[in-house]
């Protein structure tokens, strides 16, 4: 006779086989949908960057904005990385390396989506202004595409991360509870980075507004 532990292991293996048999095609379809979303965001990026950036003066102003935005992003992501590493160590210590890996995957892909989306949005600003000089429809099209890039990246990378990591965990015969913890950690990592980016972005834009207002009132106080 089998012990209860051996019977439980057999049941778990049979359960996983049923899941993989019935849902593997669905998981692959979801992964393919994520690939399509990322690929389409890449296509939209190419369309935006290939459009006209306006005259020399517009490009000069746009370059200054892009330099400032990139400097802000680099500084912000350094801070996020420090906090992220600390949280990663805590999660890995109290749970397991698989949960920590899930957290890392979510945080990394969320950071990639935010960084790429921000850079594309900044580059799209001047192109939207130039297109709007021709007609409002052209400007609206570029603005809509630039906004769609971030949304597509977030959705596409999320689908890819969840489905692929889930398939890996199933194939490794990981306990069901551990799988849930790992996937929750993946979502937690993505949410943590997005919260930092959202709050930091709001503070950055508000600071830029304040500086512009101060500059208009008194040039000599801009350094203060």
Model-derived regions, located:
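Single conserved hydrophobic/aromatic residue that forms the stacking wall/gate
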Residues: 1-14, 215, 222-224
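Short, strongly hydrophobic alpha-helical membrane anchors
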Residues: 13-23
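Hydrophobic, small-residue-rich transmembrane alpha-helices and their short perimembrane loops
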Residues: 21-217
């Amino acid at each position: 006779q089998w012990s209860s532990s051996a019977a439980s292991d057999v049941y778990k293996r049979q359960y996983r086989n049923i899941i993989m048999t019935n849902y593997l095609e669905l998981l692959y379809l979801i992964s393919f949908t994520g690939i399509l979303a990322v690929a389409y965001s890449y296509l939209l990026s190419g369309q935006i960057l290939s459009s006209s950036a306006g005259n020399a003066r517009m490009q000069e102003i746009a370059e200054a904005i892009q330099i400032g935005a990139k400097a802000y992003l680099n500084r912000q992501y350094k801070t996020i990385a420090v906090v992220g590493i600390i949280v990663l160590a805590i999660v890995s210590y109290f749970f397991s390396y698989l949960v920590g890996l899930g957290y890392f995957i979510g945080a990394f892909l969320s950071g990639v989506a935010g960084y790429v989306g921000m850079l594309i949005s900044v580059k799209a600003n001047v192109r939207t202004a130039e297109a709007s000089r021709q007609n409002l429809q052209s400007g609206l099209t570029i603005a809509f595409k630039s906004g769609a890039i971030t949304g597509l990246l977030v959705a596409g990378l999320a689908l890819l991360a969840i489905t692929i990591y889930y398939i890996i965990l199933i194939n490794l015969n990981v306990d069901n509870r551990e799988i849930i913890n790992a996937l929750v950690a993946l979502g937690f990592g993505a949410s943590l980075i997005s919260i930092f980016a959202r709050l930091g972005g709001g503070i950055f834009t508000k600071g830029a507004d304040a500086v512009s207002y101060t500059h208009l009132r008194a040039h000599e106080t801009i350094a203060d």
